[in-house]
């Protein structure tokens, strides 16, 4: 058993879990961490997507009571049916656009300028969204996910598609997009987490199926360690974030994104990291 490889898998799992649900782009951080660890071949790229499943188990655990009650009520209660429909409607745009344009995006948009621009522009959008809600609280019209309409969900789903641009952040696009669409910070964050469940499970399953020829049973320990550490770090991160947003905004994450965008350019120009698929 390659202990060094398992340590790398654990580190990558921690990076995935800590960054997947914060509005800072897990993809950008995994690329940087993988380059620094020498863990960036084709198999590692499949690994990066597959270990998102560990983070999803963390979401399911944190929100289990809501998920369980929704599943039980689904056959009879309209509110549960509406909630499930909203998650499904929000999920569909990413599936369609991912299948249509996924290869083209990987071929043309994984460049230092695109990744850095996504980080920096995303940071300024977060600053704007937070300033907008703080200056005009009347823009908040939805305070919980149960109050969302199907059209609200579709709009958030369309915004999620922006995360196909590397460096954008799936959670960042859905949370900040939701806030700009009138959701409270808490409602936008909750819906982003619920939407992550089908989105990331689908992405992980598709990646494993598509690149199954690269994998063997010998890789099971590496994937198992990555999934475990992804789950544990994501669970801690989600619990922390839900407490954080109760009394804080996303402004610190905006400045972090801007700084990280500069790091992307610096590492690319110095040759430390190859920001390409």
Curated annotation (Swiss-Prot):
It is an enzyme of class 3 (hydrolase). The keyword S-adenosyl-L-methionine does not apply. Coiled coil: none annotated. GO terms for cellular component: plasma membrane. The chain crosses the membrane at residues 3-23, 44-64, 82-102, 109-129, 189-209, 218-238, 253-273. One of its GO terms (molecular function) is undecaprenyl-diphosphatase activity. InterPro entries: UppP. The keyword Cell inner membrane applies. Belongs to the UppP family. Catalyzes the dephosphorylation of undecaprenyl diphosphate (UPP). Confers resistance to bacitracin. HAMAP family: Undec_diphosphatase. This is Undecaprenyl-diphosphatase. It comes from Polaromonas naphthalenivorans (strain CJ2).
